[in-house]
């Protein structure tokens, strides 16, 4: 009888844990959709749509990046404090010394690796600081949907950087995915080359140059970030520490660059906001949504399989494109729809193969245990 009761209690406990996990996943996915769909709409609104009766366009992308980094850093510090405090209450006093809630401690408590941590953090923040404004510059010459489509696949820039700097070889399916995505983006962009607006001058070649440069910098950022996480650190670099410190560095570099070389953008932004106060609401909303969205990404990565994050991210980007078409009146030709299909088909193929690989690994582990 005692054994049967123990089995029942264990079953109820597992059932409760599964329900809590499912509820957490639903909240995180809904949060991811809600924040990043809003973020995407505001991004297009700020960068490509006119304000006021005079139809003035906001042309200070560095300021957008500056404000986004500030809010992401603040929310990152809050997220880091909450997660480290929660973790500390569940650990012993011995472990508490290693779970330091001060994110700056990673620069002083890792012995010989202190310099490497600082070096990688500076490099990541610089490449990230440059990538975003260059990407926004491409919007002067390309449609927002082309920008969104190209940014939907992070595999290509990562492959380019690894090939150039590390001579890395990839599985054959990744070359197929990269080919499908590249073909899709080119088809989508070139099929709409004749269309231009006041904000889009139709100079597709220049726009693609900016976009490719931004994507390569994204790849360098992601690859260097991978190297940072591989460092043997005693005081581990958590997602909260990375988010808070990285965005703080981006804010510092962008502030210095703006003050030294683009001080006029500060005055321009202040005057623009005085004339069109709704811009300030849009930028703050954009920054907050992006920062909170990052937190949901980290929670999903920490508590669930990466395949769940990939699936949620891909479907979110598809919804972003659909919302952009509906809300901002984009008209896509059949060639562009084929391009969209190729891009998301390639991303979907990558997700499917990763899912199969994970399933096979789990089956092997189970067979070894049995």
UniProtKB/Swiss-Prot annotation:
Q: Does the keyword Transmembrane apply?
A: yes
InterPro entries named in the record: SCL35B1-4/HUT1
Which family is it part of? Belongs to the nucleotide-sugar transporter family. SLC35B subfamily.
Where does this polypeptide localize?
Endoplasmic reticulum membrane
- Domain of life of the native organism: Eukaryota
**Listed GO molecular functions?**
UDP-galactose transmembrane transporter activity; UDP-glucose transmembrane transporter activity
> Chief localization class?
endoplasmic reticulum
Please describe what this protein does.
May be involved in specific transport of UDP-Gal from the cytosol to the Golgi lumen. Involved in the maintenance of optimal conditions for the folding of secretory pathway proteins in the endoplasmic reticulum.
Q: What Gene Ontology cellular-component terms does the record carry? A: endoplasmic reticulum membrane; Golgi membrane
Swiss-Prot/TrEMBL GO biological process terms = UDP-galactose transmembrane transport; UDP-glucose transmembrane transport into endoplasmic reticulum
Q: Which residues form a coiled coil?
A: none
Membrane topology of the entry: Multi-pass membrane protein
- Protein name, as recorded: UDP-galactose transporter homolog 1
Which residue spans traverse the membrane? Answer: 22-42, 62-82, 115-135, 145-165, 175-195, 204-224, 242-262, 280-300, 307-327, 333-353
Q: Which UniProt keywords apply?
A: Endoplasmic reticulum, Membrane, Sugar transport, Transmembrane, Transmembrane helix, Transport
Q: Give the disulfide map.
A: none
């Amino acid at each position: 009888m005692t054994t049967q009761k123990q089995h029942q209690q264990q079953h109820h406990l597992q059932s409760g844990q599964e329900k809590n996990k499912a509820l957490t996943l639903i909240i995180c996915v809904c949060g991811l959709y809600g924040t990043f769909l809003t973020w995407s709409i505001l991004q297009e609104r700020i960068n490509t749509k006119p304000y006021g009766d005079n139809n003035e366009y906001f042309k200070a992308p560095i300021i957008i990046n500056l404000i986004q980094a500030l809010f992401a850093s603040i929310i990152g510090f809050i997220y880091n404090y909450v997660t480290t405090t929660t973790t500390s209450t569940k650990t012993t006093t011995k472990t508490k010394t290693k779970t330091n809630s001060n994110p700056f401690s990673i620069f002083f408590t890792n012995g010989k690796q202190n310099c490497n941590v600082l070096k990688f953090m500076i490099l990541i923040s610089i490449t990230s600081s440059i990538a975003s404004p260059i990407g926004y510059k491409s919007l002067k010459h390309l449609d927002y949907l082309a920008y969104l489509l190209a940014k939907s696949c992070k595999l290509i820039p990562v492959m380019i950087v690894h090939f150039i700097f590390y001579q890395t070889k990839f599985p054959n399916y990744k070359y197929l995915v990269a080919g499908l995505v590249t073909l899709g983006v080119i088809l989508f962009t070139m099929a709409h080359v004749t269309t231009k607006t006041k904000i889009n001058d139709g100079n597709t070649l220049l726009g693609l140059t900016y976009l490719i440069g931004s994507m390569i910098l994204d790849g360098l950022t992601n690859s260097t970030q991978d190297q940072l996480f591989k460092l043997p650190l005693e005081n581990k670099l958590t997602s909260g520490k990375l988010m808070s410190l990285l965005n703080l560095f981006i804010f510092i570099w962008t502030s210095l660059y703006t003050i030294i070389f683009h001080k006029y953008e500060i005055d321009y932004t202040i005057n623009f906001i005085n004339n069109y106060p709704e811009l300030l609401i849009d930028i703050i909303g954009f920054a907050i949504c992006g920062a909170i969205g990052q937190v949901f990404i980290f929670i999903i990565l920490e508590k669930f399989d990466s395949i769940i994050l990939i699936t949620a991210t891909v479907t979110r980007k598809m919804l972003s494109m659909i919302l952009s078409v509906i809300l901002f009146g984009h008209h896509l030709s059949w060639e562009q729809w084929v391009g969209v299909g190729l891009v998301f088909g390639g991303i979907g193929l990558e997700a499917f193969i990763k899912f199969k690989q994970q399933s096979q690994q789990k089956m092997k582990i189970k067979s070894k245990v049995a």
